[in-house]
Regions:
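DNA-contacting interfaces and partner/effector-binding or oligomerization modules
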Residues: 2-150
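K/R-rich mixed-charge low-complexity regions
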Residues: 149-225
Length: 225
Protein backbone atom coordinates (compact mmCIF):
# COMPACT_ATOMS: atom_id res chain seq x y z
CA UNK A 1 0.00 0.00 0.00
CA UNK A 2 1.18 3.52 -0.72
CA UNK A 3 2.70 5.06 2.45
CA UNK A 4 1.09 8.49 2.24
CA UNK A 5 -2.52 9.35 3.00
CA UNK A 6 -3.12 13.08 2.60
CA UNK A 7 -6.37 14.75 3.66
CA UNK A 8 -5.77 18.47 4.13
CA UNK A 9 -8.12 21.40 4.12
CA UNK A 10 -8.53 23.53 0.99
CA UNK A 11 -9.04 27.24 1.64
CA UNK A 12 -10.14 28.70 -1.70
CA UNK A 13 -11.56 25.81 -3.73
CA UNK A 14 -15.00 24.23 -3.47
CA UNK A 15 -16.91 21.58 -5.46
CA UNK A 16 -18.82 23.01 -8.41
CA UNK A 17 -21.80 21.97 -10.48
CA UNK A 18 -21.11 21.63 -14.23
CA UNK A 19 -22.32 24.37 -16.58
CA UNK A 20 -23.45 22.93 -19.89
CA UNK A 21 -26.87 24.51 -20.32
CA UNK A 22 -25.82 26.49 -23.39
CA UNK A 23 -23.35 26.41 -26.26
CA UNK A 24 -20.68 27.94 -24.02
CA UNK A 25 -18.96 24.55 -23.84
CA UNK A 26 -17.91 24.69 -27.50
CA UNK A 27 -18.49 28.26 -28.71
CA UNK A 28 -15.32 30.34 -29.02
CA UNK A 29 -17.32 33.58 -29.11
CA UNK A 30 -18.23 34.88 -25.65
CA UNK A 31 -20.10 38.17 -25.28
CA UNK A 32 -18.68 39.36 -28.59
CA UNK A 33 -15.07 38.44 -27.82
CA UNK A 34 -13.16 35.85 -29.88
CA UNK A 35 -11.32 33.30 -27.74
CA UNK A 36 -8.94 30.46 -28.51
CA UNK A 37 -11.21 28.00 -26.67
CA UNK A 38 -14.66 28.11 -25.10
CA UNK A 39 -15.18 30.32 -22.04
CA UNK A 40 -15.77 27.23 -19.90
CA UNK A 41 -12.22 26.01 -20.52
CA UNK A 42 -10.85 29.36 -19.36
CA UNK A 43 -13.02 28.95 -16.28
CA UNK A 44 -11.42 25.54 -15.65
CA UNK A 45 -7.94 27.01 -16.17
CA UNK A 46 -8.73 29.64 -13.55
CA UNK A 47 -10.02 26.98 -11.14
CA UNK A 48 -6.96 24.76 -11.56
CA UNK A 49 -4.65 27.72 -10.91
CA UNK A 50 -6.70 28.32 -7.75
CA UNK A 51 -6.24 24.67 -6.80
CA UNK A 52 -2.49 25.07 -7.25
CA UNK A 53 -2.51 28.13 -4.98
CA UNK A 54 -4.60 26.20 -2.48
CA UNK A 55 -2.11 23.34 -2.44
CA UNK A 56 0.84 25.70 -2.17
CA UNK A 57 -0.58 27.85 0.64
CA UNK A 58 -1.82 24.86 2.64
CA UNK A 59 1.26 22.67 2.03
CA UNK A 60 -0.82 20.01 0.28
CA UNK A 61 1.57 17.83 -1.76
CA UNK A 62 0.83 15.88 -4.91
CA UNK A 63 1.70 12.22 -4.49
CA UNK A 64 4.12 10.68 -6.99
CA UNK A 65 2.79 7.12 -6.95
CA UNK A 66 5.62 5.84 -9.18
CA UNK A 67 8.55 7.06 -7.10
CA UNK A 68 6.81 6.96 -3.69
CA UNK A 69 7.36 10.61 -2.83
CA UNK A 70 5.52 13.86 -2.28
CA UNK A 71 5.78 16.72 -4.78
CA UNK A 72 5.42 20.24 -3.42
CA UNK A 73 3.10 22.41 -5.51
CA UNK A 74 4.48 25.83 -6.43
CA UNK A 75 2.63 28.16 -8.78
CA UNK A 76 4.86 29.97 -11.28
CA UNK A 77 4.31 33.56 -10.13
CA UNK A 78 6.39 34.98 -12.98
CA UNK A 79 4.29 33.26 -15.63
CA UNK A 80 1.01 34.25 -13.97
CA UNK A 81 2.19 37.74 -12.98
CA UNK A 82 -0.65 39.45 -14.89
CA UNK A 83 -3.39 37.24 -13.44
CA UNK A 84 -3.50 39.03 -10.07
CA UNK A 85 -3.24 35.77 -8.13
CA UNK A 86 -4.63 37.23 -4.91
CA UNK A 87 -7.87 37.79 -6.81
CA UNK A 88 -7.75 34.27 -8.25
CA UNK A 89 -7.85 32.98 -4.68
CA UNK A 90 -10.95 34.91 -3.69
CA UNK A 91 -12.86 36.31 -6.69
CA UNK A 92 -15.61 34.66 -8.66
CA UNK A 93 -14.40 33.80 -12.14
CA UNK A 94 -16.92 36.10 -13.85
CA UNK A 95 -15.77 39.12 -11.82
CA UNK A 96 -12.10 38.35 -12.43
CA UNK A 97 -12.70 37.75 -16.14
CA UNK A 98 -14.18 41.22 -16.68
CA UNK A 99 -10.83 42.77 -15.77
CA UNK A 100 -8.53 40.12 -17.24
CA UNK A 101 -10.22 39.04 -20.47
CA UNK A 102 -7.87 41.17 -22.56
CA UNK A 103 -5.13 38.64 -21.75
CA UNK A 104 -7.05 35.87 -23.54
CA UNK A 105 -8.91 37.57 -26.42
CA UNK A 106 -7.74 36.82 -29.94
CA UNK A 107 -6.88 39.65 -32.33
CA UNK A 108 -9.84 40.53 -34.57
CA UNK A 109 -9.80 41.93 -38.13
CA UNK A 110 -10.01 45.73 -38.30
CA UNK A 111 -10.24 48.40 -40.96
CA UNK A 112 -6.91 50.21 -41.40
CA UNK A 113 -5.89 53.52 -42.89
CA UNK A 114 -2.17 52.80 -42.94
CA UNK A 115 -0.27 49.59 -43.62
CA UNK A 116 2.16 48.41 -40.95
CA UNK A 117 5.36 46.52 -41.75
CA UNK A 118 4.45 43.45 -39.69
CA UNK A 119 4.70 39.86 -40.92
CA UNK A 120 1.96 38.81 -38.47
CA UNK A 121 -0.72 40.57 -40.53
CA UNK A 122 -2.36 40.09 -43.91
CA UNK A 123 -3.60 43.08 -45.90
CA UNK A 124 -6.42 42.13 -48.25
CA UNK A 125 -8.32 44.29 -50.71
CA UNK A 126 -12.07 43.60 -50.58
CA UNK A 127 -14.66 44.96 -52.98
CA UNK A 128 -17.34 46.54 -50.77
CA UNK A 129 -20.01 45.46 -53.23
CA UNK A 130 -19.44 41.78 -52.46
CA UNK A 131 -21.77 39.84 -50.20
CA UNK A 132 -20.45 38.94 -46.77
CA UNK A 133 -20.55 35.21 -47.58
CA UNK A 134 -18.46 35.76 -50.72
CA UNK A 135 -15.89 37.79 -48.78
CA UNK A 136 -15.54 35.06 -46.16
CA UNK A 137 -15.20 32.38 -48.83
CA UNK A 138 -12.53 34.40 -50.63
CA UNK A 139 -10.51 35.09 -47.49
CA UNK A 140 -10.58 31.42 -46.54
CA UNK A 141 -9.14 30.60 -49.92
CA UNK A 142 -6.33 33.12 -49.56
CA UNK A 143 -5.18 32.39 -46.03
CA UNK A 144 -3.67 29.10 -44.92
CA UNK A 145 -5.04 27.75 -41.62
CA UNK A 146 -2.80 27.97 -38.56
CA UNK A 147 -2.93 26.39 -35.10
CA UNK A 148 -1.30 29.35 -33.38
CA UNK A 149 -3.15 31.96 -31.34
CA UNK A 150 -2.62 35.69 -30.87
CA UNK A 151 -3.63 36.14 -27.24
CA UNK A 152 -1.08 36.66 -24.48
CA UNK A 153 -2.21 33.53 -22.58
CA UNK A 154 -3.28 30.45 -24.51
CA UNK A 155 -4.62 27.00 -23.64
CA UNK A 156 -2.05 24.46 -24.83
CA UNK A 157 -3.88 21.15 -24.43
CA UNK A 158 -7.09 19.86 -26.00
CA UNK A 159 -8.97 19.45 -22.74
CA UNK A 160 -12.63 18.48 -22.73
CA UNK A 161 -14.84 20.42 -20.37
CA UNK A 162 -16.77 17.74 -18.47
CA UNK A 163 -13.85 15.30 -17.95
CA UNK A 164 -11.76 18.23 -16.67
CA UNK A 165 -14.61 19.34 -14.43
CA UNK A 166 -14.88 15.80 -13.04
CA UNK A 167 -11.15 15.71 -12.24
CA UNK A 168 -11.50 19.02 -10.42
CA UNK A 169 -14.38 17.82 -8.25
CA UNK A 170 -12.80 14.45 -7.49
CA UNK A 171 -9.66 16.14 -6.17
CA UNK A 172 -11.69 18.43 -3.91
CA UNK A 173 -14.02 15.68 -2.67
CA UNK A 174 -11.00 13.57 -1.83
CA UNK A 175 -9.54 16.39 0.27
CA UNK A 176 -12.88 16.89 1.98
CA UNK A 177 -12.42 13.35 3.27
CA UNK A 178 -14.88 11.44 1.06
CA UNK A 179 -14.09 7.81 0.31
CA UNK A 180 -13.89 6.57 -3.27
CA UNK A 181 -17.26 4.85 -2.90
CA UNK A 182 -18.80 8.10 -1.65
CA UNK A 183 -17.22 9.99 -4.56
CA UNK A 184 -18.83 7.53 -6.99
CA UNK A 185 -22.22 8.42 -5.47
CA UNK A 186 -21.45 12.14 -5.67
CA UNK A 187 -20.50 11.81 -9.34
CA UNK A 188 -23.70 9.94 -10.06
CA UNK A 189 -25.69 12.81 -8.59
CA UNK A 190 -23.78 15.75 -10.06
CA UNK A 191 -23.39 14.37 -13.59
CA UNK A 192 -26.48 12.18 -13.91
CA UNK A 193 -27.87 14.12 -16.88
CA UNK A 194 -24.70 14.00 -18.98
CA UNK A 195 -24.97 10.78 -20.92
CA UNK A 196 -22.23 11.53 -23.45
CA UNK A 197 -19.42 11.76 -20.90
CA UNK A 198 -17.74 8.76 -19.31
CA UNK A 199 -18.23 9.07 -15.56
CA UNK A 200 -15.97 7.01 -13.24
CA UNK A 201 -18.09 4.19 -11.82
CA UNK A 202 -15.59 2.14 -9.80
CA UNK A 203 -12.74 2.78 -7.40
CA UNK A 204 -9.98 2.13 -9.93
CA UNK A 205 -11.40 4.71 -12.35
CA UNK A 206 -11.71 7.20 -9.48
CA UNK A 207 -8.03 6.63 -8.74
CA UNK A 208 -7.07 7.21 -12.39
CA UNK A 209 -9.11 10.41 -12.58
CA UNK A 210 -7.60 11.65 -9.33
CA UNK A 211 -4.06 11.06 -10.54
CA UNK A 212 -4.84 12.72 -13.86
CA UNK A 213 -6.24 15.71 -11.98
CA UNK A 214 -3.14 15.87 -9.80
CA UNK A 215 -0.89 15.91 -12.88
CA UNK A 216 -3.03 18.71 -14.29
CA UNK A 217 -2.59 20.74 -11.10
CA UNK A 218 1.19 20.37 -11.40
CA UNK A 219 1.33 21.30 -15.09
CA UNK A 220 -1.09 24.20 -14.64
CA UNK A 221 0.97 25.54 -11.75
CA UNK A 222 3.98 25.60 -14.08
CA UNK A 223 2.02 27.54 -16.72
CA UNK A 224 0.81 24.75 -19.01
CA UNK A 225 -2.91 24.10 -19.28
Amino acid sequence: MYPYTVYMTLTYSKPLNPRTGSNRVSNRIFKGDVLGRSIQMYRMWFLFVRLGLDCEDNNIPIIDHVNNKKIKVKVNKKFYRKWDLDRVKEDKFDDWWKDKKHLFIETEPTLVNEIEDDDNYYYIKVDKRLKKEDVIRGVRGLIKPTKTFTSEYTINTQHKYLPTHIKYNIFIWKHLGYTRKEIIDLLGGSYRYYYKVRIPKDESSIRRSLRSGERLILSTSKGVF
